[in-house]
């Protein structure tokens, strides 16, 4: 479902593809040098974050970080230059027929990026609308109207413009 939903929601942005790639062929056809270049570009100290929790001092953490990470070459600074997804100006629909355990309905709307101040309102709305059996969607559409066997509302929480999703199993 997510493969179809992402491709429907995003026309230009890389979010239209799953993290592993657009098609399995991308992985199958990758050459060892391609994989090494990708690893070198994305998995280096210049692009890393280290989080430490526990019973240790700042000085201990710095000493251990220097011991284990300082010998690793920093790598080139990687700056993503991705154009934002153009505004969606019309509804997009897709109906998929497949041999699945239950029918489902997925609806999605574009939302602000995670660092936008309005993101927090979206987070609260999705909790009220579709998180758990006490949520408004569950009470109305599962309990009262019995249109769905389950329903939820959530957001993708993406760094760039994400999606608010409602999905229901029929």
What are these regions (language model features)?
Residues 7, 77-136:
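His/Glu-based metal-binding/catalytic segments typifying zinc-dependent metallopeptidases
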Residues 1-77, 95, 113, 121, ...:
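Charge-rich, well-structured scaffold segments of protease-associated domains
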Residues 136-144:
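Short amphipathic alpha-helix segments
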């Amino acid at each position: 479902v997510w493969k179809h939903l992402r491709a429907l929601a995003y026309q230009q942005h890389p979010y239209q593809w799953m993290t592993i790639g657009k098609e399995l062929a991308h992985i199958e056809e990758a050459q060892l040098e391609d994989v090494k270049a990708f690893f070198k570009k994305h998995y280096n100290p210049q692009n890393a974050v280290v989080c430490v929790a526990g019973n240790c001092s700042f000085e201990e953490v710095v000493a251990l970080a220097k011991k284990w990470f300082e010998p690793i070459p920093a790598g080139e600074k990687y700056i993503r230059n991705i154009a934002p997804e153009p505004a969606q100006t019309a509804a997009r629909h897709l109906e998929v027929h497949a041999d699945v355990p239950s029918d489902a309905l997925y609806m999605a709307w574009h939302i602000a990026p995670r660092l936008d101040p309005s993101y927090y309102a979206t987070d609260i709305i999705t909790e009220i609308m579709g998180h758990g059996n006490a949520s408004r969607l569950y009470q109305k559409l599962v309990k009262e109207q019995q249109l769905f066997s389950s329903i939820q509302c959530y957001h993708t929480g993406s760094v760039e413009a994400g999606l608010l999703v409602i999905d229901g199993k029929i």
